[in-house]
Amino acid sequence: LYENIIGDKMNTANIFNIQKFSVHDGPGIRTTVFFKGCPLKCLWCHNPESQNINTQILYDRDKCVLCGTCEKICHKKAIKIENNKLTTDESCDCCGQCVIYCIQGARQIAGKVYTVDDVMKEVLKDRVFYEKSSGGVTLSGGEPLIHIDFVEELLKKLKDNNIHTAVDTCGAVSFENLKRAAKYTDVFLYDIKLMDDEKHVEFIGMSNKLILENIRKLSEIHNNINLRMPIIEGVNGDEEHIIKTIEFIEGLNISKVNLLPYHDIAKHKYKKLGKVYEDDRMSKPSDEKMQKFKEMFENKGYKAKIGG
């Protein structure tokens, strides 16, 4: 597991986006802070740039005109254009100069080291919108709780400023991290992707045992857990998965269930990262199936919604 492995000081973390006016990451209008680094490797991940904890450069070949500017300004000589093809070798230190000088916008940086005060300065700009809409700030990723020292300090400062807090977590961290965050978190957005452990390893890269154990423990100390479930044909788009999930969460403090239909709108990000998007086994479930799954939760007394 990742644990506090970014930055020399406890109040720094690598963040790849601070998204304003989010309306799918908790109640009201929110600012979502996206942290880099995740212990999971979901095949459908819609933020693949979040998986690696380090800063990365994304390259869009379709926008690149091979002008050579990036090659000339790279102080590491990491960028080469040969035979009408641009490559970047491992000596790249992600300084971002190539991003700044690329007039075509073909290069993009994912990841910037922030202090807690840097983040507070950004999120406080939209305080009036939180107050008017009963919104707040959501910490997401990646997995924010691998940066627990930073996250705990940030959450505390948000609560000191009377700002509603949400933490979107995959649960694959030590329970101590969840416990530390829980003191200052109004709602947890907790992801459960697969109940079948073998499938969990196949599609996500690790066992689900820690994730399931942690939500049980979290339910004992926190009374506002929003369960979030991606629904993907070919992975978990079957009634058996829904039945097993309902059986598992019985007795837990689940305040709401969000069923998130699969999409592949992030496919282009994989290409920019030099990765292959393995979508041959995955597809979007029908509207009828999503409605049926929603009703299965509602029939057991849960408040359920399709989408975020």
Regions found by a protein language model. Give the residues of each.
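Auxiliary Fe-S-binding modules of radical SAM enzymes
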Residues: I5-P27, I231-G308
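Short gly/ser/thr-rich secondary-structure transition/capping motifs
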Residues: N14-F16, E82, D168-A172
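N-terminal pre-triad scaffold of radical SAM enzymes
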Residues: I15-T69, K85-C94
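N-terminal-biased segments
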Residues: G26-P27, F34, N52, Q56-R61, ...
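Iron-sulfur cluster-binding cysteine motifs and their immediate structural context
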Residues: L43-S50, T69-T87, Q97-K112
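Short glycine-enriched, charge-decorated loop/helix-capping segments at active-site entrances
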Residues: R61, V201-S207, G274-M282
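Conserved AdoMet/S-adenosylmethionine-binding subsite of the radical SAM
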Residues: D117-K271
